[in-house]
Amino acid sequence: MSNTQLSYKDAGVDIHTGNELVERIKGDVKRTRRSEVMGGLGGFGALCALPTKYKEPILVSGTDGVGTKLRLAIDLKKHDTIGQDLVAMCVNDLIVQGAEPLFFLDYYATGKLDVDVAASVIKGIADGCEMSGCALVGGETAEMPGMYHEGDYDLAGFCVGVVEKSEIIDGTAVKTGDTLIALGSSGAHSNGYSLIRKVLEVSGANPTDLLEGKPLSEHLLAPTKIYVKSILQLIKQTEVHAIAHLTGGGFWENIPRVLPDNTKAVIDESSWQWPAIFNWLQEKGNISRYEMYRTFNCGVGMVIALPEKEVETALALLEQSGEKAWVIGKIEHLGESEAQVEIQ
């Protein structure tokens, strides 16, 4: 038996470094604060009151990560926007049900804590929370020696929002004849990155290669767009029947999640042009059209179903909110043996 006294630091966990990170991020956390939040960082649990404007508040929760986009961000040492990706993946799932995001928590795990990297990531999380009006109320930073390769870390997020019970958007109001409006994406968002990385591998492309005057890395690591404020504004002023967030599974799997069984979405492929990065991926990876629409958003972040009479108002509101929005299709009756999404 050794007489040497061991400490937690000897085992690879530096509590002082963790405390240093907490001090670094306090300002970022503070700027996301909502009036409903009680207390600050450091408690065993975060306290948050329900907004008083809701008569029958229903809580909506979601959790997500950023997939292997994180691998690309780590390899390219681009840590400042991956946090926005994390928030976007959670809050965009909440808003499709009409829920206003209330608070967010993150989980950051690594083998050896690098305060500069972690602070950059959490600043991005705070940026995303600020964009969505959501309070960053806490999180977990886990330093776990032997669990990760040097320089690697993992991220997960958890978000809770609130919606008036009578105003929940669940797709049951969708009717034949409804119009479908698309909201443009900022890129691949946070889905399909295992295929993206495979395309980079087989094509021999370098992230510094230019595409339309910008390095591939800028196209591929463009932060996921957050639609919360523009959609909250839309649902306050128009009648929205359903919203689909195009994430993993693309068009084929996400749109049917919000459609009644007797309806189908007919998408007009000529209504928009794929952003250059998707054409590049399809060409370099020899990816089929079907697989593209199953894996990527192909330039469409959200699809909104609403009555035809609301289209003009909706497009104007979305444009005022800074969204690229257009009519992408319509809802039709689903025939026997037909798929719920038809792209023509």
From Swiss-Prot:
A Pfam entry, by short name: AIRS
Reactions catalysed according to its record: 2-formamido-N(1)-(5-O-phospho-beta-D-ribosyl)acetamidine + ATP = 5-amino-1-(5-phospho-beta-D-ribosyl)imidazole + ADP + phosphate + H(+)
Q: This chain belongs to which protein, by name?
A: Phosphoribosylformylglycinamidine cyclo-ligase
Q: Which GO terms describe its biological process?
A: 'de novo' IMP biosynthetic process; adenine biosynthetic process; purine nucleotide biosynthetic process
| Keywords assigned by UniProt, alphabetized | ATP-binding, Cytoplasm, Ligase, Nucleotide-binding, Purine biosynthesis
Q: Say which domain of life the source belongs to.
A: Bacteria
Q: Where in the cell is it found?
A: Cytoplasm
Keyword set includes Cell inner membrane = no
Got a GO cellular component term for this one? cytosol
Listed GO MF terms: ATP binding; phosphoribosylamine-glycine ligase activity; phosphoribosylformylglycinamidine cyclo-ligase activity
Q: What class of enzyme is it?
A: ligase
Q: What is its EC number?
A: 6.3.3.1
**Similarity-based family:** Belongs to the AIR synthase family.
Pathway annotation: Purine metabolism; IMP biosynthesis via de novo pathway; 5-amino-1-(5-phospho-D-ribosyl)imidazole from N(2)-formyl-N(1)-(5-phospho-D-ribosyl)glycinamide: step 2/2
| Keyword Kinase among record annotations | no
